[in-house]
Amino acid sequence: MLSPAIKSRLRKLPGFRIASFLRRLTRDTETRNAALMLLRPPAGLYQPWGATSDNRYPEAFLSVRALAGDAPTTRILSFGCSTGEEVFSLRKYFPQATLIGLDINPWNILLCRYRKWRKGDARMHFAVAGSTTTQPSESYDAVFAMAVFRHGELNITPPPPRCDHLIRFSSFEQSIADLARILKPGGLLAMQNSMFRFEDTATASQFEPALSIDCSGPVPLYDRDNMLVPSPARETVVFRKRT
């Protein structure tokens, strides 16, 4: 296995991105579909490749469950749900709630719907979307946006001093404003593994912190000007919308 330093040098070689793209085309179907999507990136694309697993964020899941409760009227959104592991994990915490998963990759949603069909869960829904602009205002009790606002090509050693060649704070701030719009007053926004800080957005004034934890790893962090800044030891990962 190559060291992070060697990988970083390889990324700087001429033709690396083309070679990397061609390699992804020969891999599994999910990786191939993500690579093809990069040929014409859709609006709202941040992280092209899914990186998900079952029960990946138990602290945030438990916190939202304790604060939001669980009832037949509870509505929860997983924004950037990838292949559905997050949504199916949330079902264990919210057995009565309606769960909605949105993802920008049609292949991911196809897999999600197949898994839903296998489980026969009538209160679980999936749709292809790169934003929440079609969702009704104040319609969700909780929104999860985990490992969404990032890009894998920034997670190198050392990280690039700027991020705007791949992702931009202005796009992030626009996405966050719409996530806030669809939350009910008192609703919860869970966001983790982001390369931007929620607290740097204008929308943050509408929220108060609900859960802070130790940072899980060395994730590069960028400011409003898309410049690399030091990563903190702790981060707030659940926010409550003020009533």
Q: Which residues are covered by each model-predicted region?
A:
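Class I SAM-dependent methyltransferase Rossmann-like catalytic core
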Residues: 32-71
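Conserved SAM-binding loop of SAM-dependent methyltransferases across substrates and taxa
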Residues: 83-95
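Conserved SAM-binding motif I beta-strand of class I
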Residues: 98-103
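Conserved SAM-binding loop
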Residues: 112-113
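Conserved SAM-binding strand-loop segment of SAM-dependent methyltransferases
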Residues: 119-131
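A short acidic, Gly/Pro-enriched loop at the edge of an enzyme's catalytic core
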Residues: 132-147
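Mobile active-site "lid"/loop adjacent to the S-adenosyl-L-methionine
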Residues: 145-175
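Conserved beta-strand signature within the Rossmann-like core of class I S-adenosyl-L-methionine
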Residues: 176, 186-193
